[in-house]
Design a protein with these regions (language model features):
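A penicillin-recognizing enzyme superfamily signal
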Residues: 29, 79-86, 90-245
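Conserved catalytic neighborhood of penicillin-recognizing serine enzymes
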Residues: 1-51, 68, 97, 109-134, ...
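Composition-driven recognition of long, low-complexity, acid-poor segments enriched in small hydrophobic
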Residues: 216, 249-294
Length: 299
């Protein structure tokens, strides 16, 4: 893929932090290293209409997005972790995209199930395409921007993403890490509801969201079936060994672990309070207190 063209008429683009590599690189490397130039070059070659068609097929709302090359980098596309989890589930599910949902069932006070979510899925690509994408995205966690995100003793495929702030390219407004196994998709976003000069992230995804994602995935994955991928890592297929030394400083790890420990502790306190509320039969009053506690946790 083209990894050197930085200007298309009035549109200018560069790789994150101005990273320079070879003028042309294989697709698996472009994905693993989350490079902007190859993505824009691909949309330029295939056409913006194809990019919009793909976005809509994977459940993204493209109605208010400008039809410009920046769409290759997600420019103007509003999304959220749930939508991203649904989209990436198609790769984990061999081309079938399930409908993401929060509520699986609703029970009344007697425990009777009064409503159940009906699972549905649609094919958005064939199995061969999904397998090729997974093969390439396995490299994200072994040789690319997701090395710091890679959970110990587990194999994941996926993608990272970073958005620079408009007022300082050294700061970021959004950090994404999305990883999946054949059993589960974990979609993680780090940022502020509104980014300004008082609210921004001072690190890149590999030094920020990555460490939180790793801790989250190492907590979740032991409770999954542990299915393994049937495709090989594209780096391995091309004779390249994994760069399995994590990009993580002890300070970054201790800060992240401390944050997660604090969240887990507060969450457990909330659960304990909910249990006491039920046992004391003061449901309404106690439930409000518990809810207020949850809200305070995220303020």
């Amino acid at each position: 893929l083209d990894n050197h063209t930085m200007k298309y008429d009035n549109y200018k683009v560069d790789n994150y932090a101005g990273i320079k590599t070879a003028p042309e690189i294989p697709m698996y490397q472009a994905l693993a290293e989350s490079l902007n130039l190859p993505a824009v070059a691909t949309v330029k070659e295939l056409g913006i209409d194809k990019a919009f068609e793909a976005g809509e097929k994977f459940g993204l709302n493209m109605s208010s997005v400008d039809r410009v090359l920046g769409v290759a980098l997600g420019g103007g596309v509003e999304t959220n972790p749930l939508q991203m989890a649904q989209a990436y589930a198609a790769f984990a599910n061999e081309g079938l995209m399930p409908e993401a949902h929060f509520i699986t069932r609703i029970e009344n006070a007697s425990g009777q199930v009064i409503a159940t979510h009906k699972n549905s899925q649609k094919r958005v690509m064939d199995k061969s395409t999904a397998d090729k994408m997974t093969s390439m995205m396995l490299g994200t966690f072994t040789n690319g921007t997701g090395i710091s995100s890679s959970p110990e003793n587990y194999v994941m495929a996926g993608k990272t993403g970073t958005t620079e702030t408009v007022f300082n390219p050294e700061y970021t407004s959004d950090q994404w890490v999305i990883g999946y196994t054949p059993d589960v998709v974990i979609s993680h976003w780090l940022g502020f509801p509104t980014t300004d000069e008082s609210h921004y992230l001072s690190s890149s995804t590999s030094n920020g969201a990555a460490h939180i994602f790793r801790n989250i995935s190492e907590t979740i994955l032991p409770y999954t079936p542990g299915s393994t991928f049937t495709v090989k890592n594209a780096y391995e297929l091309n004779g390249i060994a994994p760069a399995n030394i994590k990009n993580q400083t002890p300070n970054a790890e201790s800060q992240t672990d401390g944050l997660l420990t604090d969240i887990r502790s507060k969450a457990q306190n909330i659960v304990d309070e909910a249990g006491r509320a039920i046992s004391e039969a003061k449901i309404k009053e106690k439930a409000q207190t518990v809810w207020d506690t949850i809200v305070d946790l995220f303020r």
